[in-house]
Each structure stands twice: as structure tokens, then as C-alpha cells.
């Protein structure tokens, strides 16, 4: 069950003109990605970072153990949507969409907001981008994958395929296999997503690598430039 969500923020050092909402992976929390946001913040003085923590709920993959999770996961292999927690995913999509709405209400245009995440958080971020009526600046998927793949074409809003997407994945990932990442990108391309920058990192496992962080920074500089 979704409960009140805790959020960590890294405030901009300059005038706030853009926001990045970044969601963690299974069993993690906002605190796990706070150093990532802090590391990039000095290069993006106009950006506010919003780091939500998922609610605690039982996870089938881990024997029903309760942990921070955006939705239930039954398996970490590609499957059909009948085996996937569509209800849980869409509940988390609403949660992240509410964070987007809060930023818009505070004066940040949707096209100056990037939504991204790692692993399970990336899944939610992709689903937010696919379904949100507001058009965002772009999406980030780190070690992510696509669920409800057989429904994505019917679920997505008209502008979703135009999104710039940064997608990074390690070839040595033992949790979310690199091939699943490739398959997910291919599925999105099949339904019209043509602006996906897919970067592979030889030998990298289920983590954030230094080169990947540099690539995310370079991509963000193009997508969320500061005031000239």
C-alpha cells in the first residue's frame, strides 16, 4: 500500500529554473542517490534535485520480505504483462506525476523537468514519461528495463516518443541483464521512440559507474541548459 512518501532535495545554488526528479531502485532509498545529486549539483546551479523514497511493501521476488519498492516484482526476467504489477506501477507513476505537478505549481515549466531513475526507479520514470499529459524535458534510465511492454503502444501519449532519453547499462549487470536493457530499448524504438541515447559500459555491474555519471552530466547539459 502506498503511504506518505519521504523526499530528499538538493536545492539549486543559483536561480531555480529546472528540476530533476530521480527515483532509486528496489530496497534502496533517496539517501542512496543523494551523493549522486550532490556530485552533479555544482555543475547545475539552476537545478533542484528531488529524490523520493518508495513505500515499504512486500516483494515477491524476495520471498515476500517488506522493503522500499515502487511496485511488486515477481521475476527479473522479461515476461508478459499478466505477470507484472501494473496496479503498483501505476500507483507509483501517480506519485511521481504529483511531484512533477508540484514543481509546475511552483513555477517550473514541465519542459524544464527531467524524470529519471535507477533500476526499478527507471521503470517508473519511463512509465511516467509514457503516460504524463505534460511534456517533460527528458528521461533517464540507469540499469533500467521496461515492463508492460506489450501495452506501451496503447498507453503512451502522443508526445512520448519524441522524448530525449539517456539510457545507460552495464554489460556485466547480474541483476537486470544487459540483454533486457537492449530488448527494452528496442521495444520503445518499435513504438516510435527515436531519440534514445543508449550507452553500454563494458563489465559494469548493477551500479552507477564513473564514466556513466560523466555521460549523464554531458546529456543533462544539453537537455537542461542554464540561463545564457
Segments predicted by a language model, with ranges:
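Short, conserved loop/helix-junction motifs that constitute active-site signature segments
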Residues: 41-44, 155-162
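Conserved alpha/beta-hydrolase "acid-adjacent" motif
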Residues: 31, 174-180, 209
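Short beta-strand/loop motif that positions the catalytic acidic residue
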Residues: 166-169, 173
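Serine-hydrolase catalytic machinery in alpha/beta-hydrolase-like enzymes
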Residues: 2-112
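Short, proline-enriched alpha-helix->beta-strand connector loops that line the catalytic pocket
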Residues: 160-165, 194
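C-terminal catalytic histidine-bearing segment of alpha/beta-hydrolase fold enzymes
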Residues: 182-228
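Primarily recognizes the serine-hydrolase "nucleophile elbow" in alpha/beta-hydrolase
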Residues: 104-158
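Short alpha-helix in the alpha/beta-hydrolase fold that links the catalytic acid
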Residues: 35-37, 153, 177-187
Amino acid at each position: 500500500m502506498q503511504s506518505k512518501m519521504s523526499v530528499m532535495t538538493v536545492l539549486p545554488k543559483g536561480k531555480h529554473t529546472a528540476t530533476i526528479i530521480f527515483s532509486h531502485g528496489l530496497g534502496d532509498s533517496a539517501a542512496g542517490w543523494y551523493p549522486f545529486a550532490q556530485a552533479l549539483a555544482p555543475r547545475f546551479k539552476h537545478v533542484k534535485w528531488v529524490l523520493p523514497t518508495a513505500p515499504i511493501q512486500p516483494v515477491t521476488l524476495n520471498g515476500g520480505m517488506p522493503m522500499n519498492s515502487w511496485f511488486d516484482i515477481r521475476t527479473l526476467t522479461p515476461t508478459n504483462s499478466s505477470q507484472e504489477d501494473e496496479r503498483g506501477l501505476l500507483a507509483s507513476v501517480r506519485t511521481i506525476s504529483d511531484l512533477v505537478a508540484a514543481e509546475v505549481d511552483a513555477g517550473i515549466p514541465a519542459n524544464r523537468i527531467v524524470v529519471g531513475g535507477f533500476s526499478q526507479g527507471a521503470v517508473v520514470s519511463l512509465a511516467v514519461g509514457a503516460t504524463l499529459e505534460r511534456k517533460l524535458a527528458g528521461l533517464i534510465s540507469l540499469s533500467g528495463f521496461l515492463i508492460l511492454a506489450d501495452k506501451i503502444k496503447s498507453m503512451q501519449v502522443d508526445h512520448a516518443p519524441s522524448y530525449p532519453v539517456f539510457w545507460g547499462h552495464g554489460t556485466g549487470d547480474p541483476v537486470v541483464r544487459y540483454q533486457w536493457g537492449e530488448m527494452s530499448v528496442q521495444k520503445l524504438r518499435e513504438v516510435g521512440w527515436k531519440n534514445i541515447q543508449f550507452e553500454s559500459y563494458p563489465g559494469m555491474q548493477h551500479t552507477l559507474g564513473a564514466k556513466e555519471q560523466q555521460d549523464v552530466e554531458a546529456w543533462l547539459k544539453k537537455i537542461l541548459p542554464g540561463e545564457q
